[in-house]
Amino acid sequence: MAKKAVSEAKQTGAAVQGKRIGIHLSTTGGVWKAVEYAREIGANTLQIFSASPRTWRAASVKPADAEKLKQARLQLDVGPLVVHVSYLVNVCSQSDETRQKSITAFRGEVERALALGAEYLVLHPGSYRGMTREQGLVLAAESIEKAIDGLPWQDADFHILIENTAGAEFSLGGSFEQVAELIERLRKHAPVGVCLDTCHTHVAGYDIVTEAGYAETMKQVGQTIGFDTVCVWHCNDAKAARGSKLDRHEHIGEGMIGAEAFRRLLHDQRFAHAAFIAETPVDEPGDDARNVALLRTLFAG
């Protein structure tokens, strides 16, 4: 099944147009190689890490690599480019040491994203364990403001996207209201938007599976975050049940959310401007191509 998906994706990759559908890819061999591979599997947008997501230190982007990436994107029409922040960053940590390391690391993330010409940088707000949610919100906003202070983001087509979380205890961003509050605090100080994750939304307790549930959930999105603020959807099926708070991604159509929910989302004109990017497992060769191909099929059908 995976081999068939790769073959079909490669046949159609050069002709991909319109809807921005992609996947998170490795940058092994060079970030521009990820762009080339994205096209091979039928994607016209992608997400990457700009450095190892499990280390605090990272090298700066080499100008030659940034230029190769720029040319590859222009030639292959791949965009937007989304960079995901390291998992270590916690901008609302109660620990002064962790928070300061997070501010420094996040500043590096912004610098690398700008150097790469990325349109979006996705950030998990973090954990406010040991504090109130309000204190966590204040710290998160202050930390982000400190991290970007003095950086030339005003001259770029660039936004920091706050991602909703799975709703685990002390996790900031588990509800649309929390995401909206953080965005509102940041609007005057940073270029911000939102990334919504289907798996996180589902396990946090929102219904996106049934038609009526989807309508109610999107009503809440409109009333809190606003549709235009959602720049990216992370398209991930879920291994766990709605409301479980367990962030376990599954292949599109093989989890508790199901293919029909993704078809409904991809056809929702309120998100016609957004990019749709999978962060699905790679259990065997060809899984990336298979998930991209299924999302394209659901959009076409």
Language model: regions and residue ranges:
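Conserved, mostly hydrophobic/aromatic
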Residues: 38, 84, 102, 113, ...
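Histidine-acidic metal/acid-base catalytic patches
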Residues: 2-5, 10, 180-301
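Aromatic/hydrophobic pocket-lining residues that form the small-molecule binding cavity
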Residues: 31, 66, 102, 106, ...
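Active-site acidic/histidine proton-transfer and metal-coordination neighborhood
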Residues: 91-193
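Acidic (Asp/Glu)-rich catalytic clusters
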Residues: 12-16, 36-43, 61-82, 109-117, ...
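Residue-level preference for long, well-ordered alpha-helices that form the structural scaffold
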Residues: 58, 62-65, 95-98, 102, ...
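Active-site beta-loop-alpha junctions enriched in small/polar residues
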Residues: 24-28, 51-53, 86-88, 126-128, ...
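N-terminal pre-domain/capping segments
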Residues: 1-85, 89-111, 301
